[in-house]
Amino acid sequence: LTSINPVTRKVLRRRLAKKTLPWLSAALPFVLLICVAAFSISFALHVEAQQKGKLSKPRQLDKGITWQRDPVTGELNLGPGLINGSEGEKSGEPRAGVIGSATVRLVPVTCSVLGGDSAVIKGLNSGNFRVYDDEVERPIQYFSAPSSDPARVAMVIDASPSVFPDSVQMRGAESALVDALAPNDEVAVVDFAAHTFLQVGFSSDRELLHRAIGRVDVRELLGDTGGSNIYEAVYLTARQLFSAPRGPQAIVLITDGEDSGLGLTTDPASAAPPAGPRGMSFDRLTFEDLARTLAAANIQVFAISTENRPKIMTAAWLAKHADATLVTPDARKLGIPPYTLYLAELVRRTGGQLYFLREAQSLSDTLRQIAQRVSAEYLLGFTPLPSTDSDAPHRGWHSLRIEVVGRTDATVVHQAAYYVPATR
């Protein structure tokens, strides 16, 4: 238009405006609608991302619960205060692990296969294994190879004042477990002192888990300095967080072992459920209740003690006593304090492993070792031996033995026995 005389240029501009203005007026609502939609989608995605990584307020797992022991079966149940973290817990009864179909009840057992150099052995199939229930071979009806199904690992961290001297080394190092597990493995974070708090439930969101671990050391600000209920925390974690296994299930317990709730001594009676008339001590948690629950649900415990290892408690000594209880009056004569004795017994019963923080290169290295072992575990399922008067399995404890055929250098590590809860 610059080469046209001013009068002509003015006329052309008027004509162009008359043609384009109606089109712009008609298109403007659609343009605004597109802009609003784009903004809404962007905002929704932003909110979803924020919610996905949102760290909720810690949930107190022991709030409002009551202990109720069945006077007929002797099994310990949780009262109506139970916060159900998984399906199938509404009855409040100790729940055995269930895999396979809904109509076939199988006993799950997790195992690690180690070579002569203690390295994990992968690549085995169901035909390589033999399972013995009370020394009777049972057919394997469920098999999950390492990494076939996601593992679930709950970190249960002692936040009581008694472990404060080791807190500098511990804090932050716990994240090594999260980073070492497979991306689809899920981790939960629980901490405890006198009370038990769920910092975050099972999640594969690594950033969220790191933030949950980072706030564990605020317990003193909450005023929870009235003791250290270690085994209650483990029990509540097992009951409220875990469900039927599809892959390995484990609890990583970091503590000094000095429980202030159960009154444990080297006398085996201190760990057993109360006998006799019902009274105040009848409806309470015992170490035996915890062992039953973990064995029934196929949950391993890997314990990291912040105390020194007793001189006699070498790896060879623990292996020698793998099939018999460690809780005997002789333990004190051997120089094993009760707080370490019961950690070792819990590990023995669940097929886990006991570590000592003060002899490890670092907590991070120990946690990475645990992650490697969990990631290389096999999950087997078999039908238990029926009782003589019904198709239901015998109630109580049953010995387990697993062999690997075709590998002379293989050692199988698994829980020594499984437990079938008694019912009316």
What label would you give each PLM region?
Residues 1-27:
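N-terminal secretory signal peptides that target proteins for export/translocation
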Residues 45, 49-424:
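Scaffold/interface architecture of coatomer-like assemblies
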Residues 12, 16, 39-41, 46:
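Intrinsic disorder/low-complexity segments
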Residues 5-9, 40, 148, 246:
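Residue-level detector of transmembrane insertion/anchoring sites
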Residues 27-42:
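Bacterial N-terminal signal peptides
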